[in-house]
Amino acid sequence: WSAVWAIPILTLSHFVLKKKIKLGYLWFLILPAAVYLATYAPMFLTGHGLDIFWGMQKQMWWYHTGLKATHPYTSPWWSWPLLARPIYLYTSNEVGGFVSRIYATGNPLIFWAGLASIIVSFVYSLKFRIKKLALVIFSYLVFFVPWAASPRIMFLYHYLPSIPFLAIALGYILRRNLKLIVPAVTIALLLFLYFYPHWAGLSVPLSLDKSYYWFSSWR
C-alpha cells in the first residue's frame, strides 16, 4: 500500500515537466490496480471470491489503523532520518565468545549525509527555482511524512520507500561538490564493510559486536 503515494508523484511530475495530463495517463491508475488484483490470482483460482478479497483489504486497513500493540524497537516517524532506533530481526546466543545478529539499520553516512542533502536541496530548489529538484524533495516527503498520521506502532523499515529519493538528493549535492565524492564513497564503503556482519547475521567476536552500538538507543 505504500506505493499508493507514487500516484501523486507521477501526477505532479507531469506538471513539473510542463506536460499535459492526457487520457493515456489513466494507465497510471488502471495498471497498478490490475497488477495488485493479479497478485491475488492464486486465491481466486482456489475458489475464493471477491468477498474474501475485500475482507483481506479491510483486515489490512484495520491492522494499520486500529491495531494496539507494543514493541521494544518501535520508533516514531520523525526519528527515522536520524537513524535513532534500528530494529533487531535476529540474535543468537553467545557461543565461544562469538555471536551473530541480523540488525536492520542503515549506513550512517547515507542516512545522515542524505538528510543534510535533503535540507540543502530544499533550499536550492527554492532559491534557484529548480523544479526537478523540488520533485525529488516532494517524493521523499510524500513517502515519509504521512506516517505521522498513523496510530499504529512503526519501525525504521517504514522509511525505506523514501531512501531512493534521499540517495538522489545526496548524489545531486555531491555532484555540485566534486571534491567530496571520493571521500564520501570511500567512507560509505568502509562503513558497509564494517556493518555488513551485523546486517547479515555473520558470527563475530563479542568485542566487535559491542562496537556496533554507537548510541544507547541502538542497543
Report each predicted region and the residues it spans:
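Hydrophobic, aromatic-rich transmembrane alpha-helices
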Residues: 93-97, 101-130
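Perimembrane helix-loop-helix junctions
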Residues: 5-33, 129, 174
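Transmembrane helical bundles and short interhelical boundary loops of multi-pass, membrane-embedded
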Residues: 12, 41, 45-46, 176-219
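Transmembrane alpha-helix segments characteristic
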Residues: 116-118, 128-148
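Hydrophobic/aromatic-rich transmembrane helices and adjacent perimembrane loops
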Residues: 5, 153-175
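Membrane-interface catalytic loops of GT-C/OST-like multi-pass glycosylation enzymes that act
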Residues: 147-160, 198-202
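Juxtamembrane membrane-water interface segments that cap and precede transmembrane helices
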Residues: 79-105, 208-219
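Aromatic-rich transmembrane-lumenal/periplasmic boundary elements in polytopic membrane proteins
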Residues: 33-83, 203-213
